[in-house]
């Protein structure tokens, strides 16, 4: 069973449709934006009680669980002009929300002695970019958290890994002005954005491989 957190748009929606097209059982969540044509479950990842309630409703179906954490937001502002509440909200969604989802499924994974957890980090976690301190902090923190959790659970056939995504054709990039996008692509050694199918292949690889654990895979076209 695959659980995709944040499946109403972007990477999460693409993965949801891709897995379903292959007749794989997958459930997804949304929070703020969905017409619910994909039969998603409304869950606020910052609310641990909502997460546990959602997992409880799915419990009869949950075996050989893969949890894919795609929910994420950003807030662009220079620190000296930033709104502390909006800055904190990025941490709450991207980091605390990911923790909440992992925390909710780990007991069941440990009981079943199987689990695959895949988190989406970002190239901005290591590549300095002005104006995205909240996003960079949230994605950097995923690295340390995932490594620690991998140590705790590796002996029970549970793997926890990150995909450090560069700039892809999905999600937030669609809001970027074309002129800026052209400049951005010019800075990527492969001279193109990441294609959705490459994200799927990387996710699938981490699902199938049981010896990669506590790792962060760079999927960035050579952008370092």
What are these regions, as identified by a protein language model?
Residues 70-76, 222:
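Conserved NAD(P)H cofactor-binding loop of Rossmann-fold oxidoreductase domains
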Residues 122:
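Residue(s) in the substrate-gating loop at a strand-loop-helix junction
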């Amino acid at each position: 069973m695959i659980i995709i957190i944040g499946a109403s748009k972007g990477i999460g929606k693409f993965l949801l449709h891709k897995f379903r097209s292959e007749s794989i059982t997958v459930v997804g969540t949304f929070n703020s934006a969905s017409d619910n044509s994909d039969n998603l479950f409304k869950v606020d990842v910052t609310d641990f009680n909502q997460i546990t309630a959602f997992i409880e409703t799915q419990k009869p179906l949950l075996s050989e669980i893969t949890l894919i954490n795609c929910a994420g937001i950003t807030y662009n502002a220079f620190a000296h002009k930033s709104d502390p509440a909006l800055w904190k909200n990025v941490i709450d969604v991207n980091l605390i929300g990911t923790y909440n989802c992992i925390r909710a499924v780990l007991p069941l994974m440990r009981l079943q002695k199987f689990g695959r957890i895949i988190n989406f980090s970002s190239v901005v976690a290591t590549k300095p970019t002005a104006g995205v301190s909240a996003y960079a902090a949230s994605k950097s923190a995923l690295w340390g958290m995932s490594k620690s959790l991998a140590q705790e659970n590796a002996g029970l056939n549970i793997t926890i890994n990150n995909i450090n995504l560069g700039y892809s054709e999905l999600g937030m990039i669609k809001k970027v002005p074309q002129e800026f996008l052209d400049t951005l692509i010019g800075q990527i050694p492969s001279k193109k954005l990441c294609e959705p199918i490459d994200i799927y292949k990387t996710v699938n690889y981490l699902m199938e491989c049981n010896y990669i654990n506590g790792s962060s895979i760079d999927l960035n076209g050579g952008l370092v």
